Amino acid sequence: MAINSPLNIAAQPGKTRLRKSLKLWQVVMMGLAYLTPMTVFDTFGIVSGISDGHVPASYLLALAGVLFTAISYGKLVRQFPEAGSAYTYAQKSINPHVGFMVGWSSLLDYLFLPMINVLLAKIYLSALFPEVPPWVWVVTFVAILTAANLKSVNLVANFNTLFVLVQISIMVVFIFLVVQGLHKGEGVGTVWSLQPFISENAHLIPIITGATIVCFSFLGFDAVTTLSEETPDAARVIPKAIFLTAVYGGVIFIAASFFMQLFFPDISRFKDPDAALPEIALYVGGKLFQSIFLCTTFVNTLASGLASHASVSRLLYVMGRDNVFPERVFGYVHPKWRTPALNVIMVGIVALSALFFDLVTATALINFGALVAFTFVNLSVFNHFWRRKGMNKSWKDHFHYLLMPLVGALTVGVLWVNLESTSLTLGLVWASLGGAYLWYLIRRYRKVPLYDGDRTPVSET
């Protein structure tokens, strides 16, 4: 049956495209902003208790596992240098139906992360200025995120570079103060100690359990793939950016947690280990440093908010260009700013829901989508290279396209086992809604709309 709807939308030279302007360092900074480096302080008390004082060992183990998935992303972006991330990879490596469900599930993560950052900003600023109504902070913060993302992705990248450097600077000062404290007899009393990695109290199972928690700190390194169509030579630049984002993020997490663990060998000093950040800053640097440190956490949310707002706008753009969502709205690119302007505004409207959500419910929304994306990216490598392209003849092929994605998938499987029941329930409800919408698309078009772009893949050698 003939259908007039644009199921396979050919690239149209006259259409406004996203502006290709990002450099490698800008993409990496966007990725680090998405990771929010200072989250290491939020989880330290919890993970230190679970791992018996070996938080950096848990981060090291988590980084090793995450890198397998990062490598899978790198392989796929060379083949499909487009902005859809896991949605595009599953769509083209497995089939459009699976791709749609992966994209729909990923939206749960991408769409609500800007709102969570707005919610955190509201919490921080309301604590500092209790006389100001919370809605003022929500509206102001959303306006800033939306305006910056409307104007230019370069503007967002430059802001994020500044904000990430501010976070790293305050962490360097923190480490300096820790070293001073260690020389004065605090903690283990010396910088030259491997106790945070290995000691008589180190046991593999507690460290692995800690790793399953800190692994969630790495969620978002894949968001840089949504910037592929705004990065010249994306097939070569984006794989580097993915790997560097994961590695640099891991180095920051490991370094910060190492010095913290030397200063706090156990959690006995914390009144509330589950929310130890204010106490950590107070014990290490005093009241003034604590105030500065807490202000920097606001910068943390601003950086992550800008990056996540940009990422979800690009994912919606690709799904709109595919006509999975109405192309006239979601596939629109502003002719002057060269940004997906309507998507940016819609994400801003969703972020206003921070007025009504609490933090526990909001955070439960995001992990499901990220794990779906990670799982199917690893499966896509296997299906595209090993199965479909027949790259299964040599031991090298088996290593790159079977063993490595399998290890990546197993690592993600550990995270699935440790996913909170609330996240799983909300995720399954969201996936059910996506399944119903997919059924509607199939009934209407007889197949899922698919973009037939003009991107040329780079051979995997």
From Swiss-Prot:
GO molecular-function term, one example from the UniProt record: putrescine transmembrane transporter activity
Induction profile: Repressed by PuuR.
Catalytic activity: putrescine(in) + H(+)(in) = putrescine(out) + H(+)(out)
Keywords assigned: Amino-acid transport, Cell inner membrane, Cell membrane, Membrane, Symport, Transmembrane, Transmembrane helix, Transport
Pfam families cross-referenced by the UniProt entry: AA_permease (PF00324)
Transmembrane segments: 27-47, 54-74, 100-120, 125-145, 162-182, 204-224, 242-262, 275-295, 344-364, 365-385, 399-419, 422-442
Cellular localisation: Cell inner membrane
Any one cellular-component term (Gene Ontology): plasma membrane
Keyword Transcription: no
Regulation: Putrescine uptake is inhibited by carbonyl cyanide m-chlorophenylhydrazone (CCCP), which dissipates the proton motive force.
Biological pathway: Amine and polyamine degradation; putrescine degradation
Membrane-related topology note: Multi-pass membrane protein
Annotated function: Involved in the uptake of putrescine. Imports putrescine for its utilization as an energy source in the absence of glucose.
Entry's family note: Belongs to the amino acid-polyamine-organocation (APC) superfamily.
Protein known as: Putrescine importer PuuP
